[in-house]
Amino acid sequence: RICLNQQSSEPQTTEICPDGEDTCY
């Protein structure tokens, strides 16, 4: 999965989608 963290300008690939303001797809 790709998680876009609003606190980071670079997307990170993770198996677990964190809760919060992150956008995962």
Curated annotation (Swiss-Prot):
Keywords, alphabetical: Acetylcholine receptor inhibiting toxin, Disulfide bond, Ion channel impairing toxin, Neurotoxin, Postsynaptic neurotoxin, Secreted, Toxin
Polar residues bias: start-end ranges: 1-15
Gene3D superfamilies in the record: CD59 (2.10.60.10)
GO CC, alphabetical: extracellular region
Cystine pairings recorded for this chain: 3-24
Name of this chain's protein: Alpha-elapitoxin-Bf1b
Organism: Bungarus fasciatus (Banded krait)
Role according to the record: Binds to muscle nicotinic acetylcholine receptor (nAChR) and inhibit acetylcholine from binding to the receptor, thereby impairing neuromuscular transmission.
Compartment list: Secreted
Gene Ontology molecular functions: acetylcholine receptor inhibitor activity; ion channel regulator activity; toxin activity
Family: Belongs to the three-finger toxin family. Short-chain subfamily. Type I alpha-neurotoxin sub-subfamily.
Tissue specificity annotation: Expressed by the venom gland.
SUPFAM superfamilies: Snake toxin-like
InterPro entries: Snake_toxin-like_sf
